[in-house]
Structures are given as C-alpha cells and as structure tokens.
Amino acid sequence: MSGGLDFACVGVRAEPYAVGPTLVFRVRITANGDDRRVHAIALRCQLRVQPAERRYSDAEAEGLGDLFGERERWGRSLNPMQFAHVSVVVPGFDGSTEVDLPVPCSYDTDIAATRYFEALTDGEVPLLLLFSGTAFRGPGGFQVEPVPWNKEALCRMPVAVWREMIDQHFPGCGWLRLPREVLTALRGYRSRHGLPSWEATVEQLLTHAEADADPAPRLLTTEGSPA
C-alpha cells in the first residue's frame, strides 16, 4: 500500500557548464508505505523567496527599499515572492532517490527576485520549494497518484552561491534592460561624443547630471548680498 512521497532539499549549487545562469537544487525524494517502488514522477516545482525568514543589515535594508519600503513597513510588506517554476521527470527508484532540479535564472534587475538577491551582502536566501505533479507507482502495474501542493521543502541558499552563478556569466558586471529607443539615444550620444565604451558613456552622463544638480555657489558682495 502506498503512503505518499516526502521531499527535502539537500543542497544547491551554481551550474558551471550551463549556457545561461542556472542554479541546481539537489532534492531527495522518499517513498512511504508498504510498497516503496516508484516507476516515475512527472514533477513540478514552484520556488518562492521567503524574505521574512532572515535578518537584514542597514546596507541591505537600504538596497531593499524599492521592494519593501522603509523598515517600519516590513511587518506588512515582506511577502513571499515568486522566483521560478520548473518541471522535471524523475526516473524510477525504490525507497528513495536524489535528483537535480535545474533552475534557469535571470540577471534582469527589473525582476523583483533578482533585485532582492542583488541587495543581499551575506548570509542565506530563504527559499520554499512547493511540489506537485503525478507519481506512477505499484508492484504489478501503474498506480497513478497526484503529488499534492502541500508537499514542500525549505532551502537556505547561501548568497555566495547566487554570486558565484552570476560571476560565471557576468564577471564583475551588472545588467540593465532598457527600451530600444533609449538604447538608440545612448548609442547616438556615445557616437557624437566619441566615447570608447558604454561604461564611459554612462559615467559622462552621470557626471553631467551631478554637475547640473549642484548649482554653482553665488558670490556675495562686501555688504553680504548676492553679486
């Protein structure tokens, strides 16, 4: 008689050979009941960030202001965030097995989860893995069982793992997604000013913006009134 399945996340690593940024979660699956033979599982997994499950330094809190507001609001604003939704076919096993769950990631800083990861300087990212799908079990044939949504596993991913993954694909760099017309305008500005790189282009724009934001001091006459 079958007794359901249990799931646990036993590790997470950056995949060095992936075409794009990819995390690999190692998941242990245990079959319960008298008959522990599983022919296959069509498994789905939703990953959520649980921001309320860790502490934050002042520097991290400042970086998270655009997501959660001021610290005074965090009692209401630190809500779970969707990170990814992936699927995998688990081969047959008897009793228990471990499988890799590859999760492609984005470095798009307009995505809330990416901005959250980038704001963290140390420690761990609290994640919740929620499983669903279909399991095929039975000694003499296939018995189809759903994997209910209440099957979940906690994972505390080191921030260093995220940074390692990003550095493998974007070493020492950040990434911004801009509308095509903005890129066209930037390209024209770079060309008109003969700038050697995009970095030099942005730095010059920032320098000019800061200069415009700081008005030149006004000279005073000997009587103390503006010249």
Language-model segment annotations:
Residues M1-V24:
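Low-complexity, acidic Ser/Thr/Pro/Gly-rich terminal tails and inter-domain linkers that flank the onset
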Residues P16-I29, V38-L47, V103-Y107:
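Contiguous beta-strand segments within globular domains
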Residues R44-Q50, E98-N150:
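Internal, hydrophobic beta-strand segments that form the core of beta-sheet-rich folds
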Residues L47-A59:
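Short aromatic-acidic-glycine turn motif
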Residues E62-E72, F136-W175:
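Short beta-strand elements
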Residues G63-A119:
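Extended, solvent-exposed segments with strong compositional bias
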Residues R180-S197:
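Surface-exposed, Lys/Arg-rich phosphate-binding patches that contact polyanionic backbones
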Residues P196-P217:
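Short, basic amphipathic alpha-helical segments that act as recognition/interaction helices
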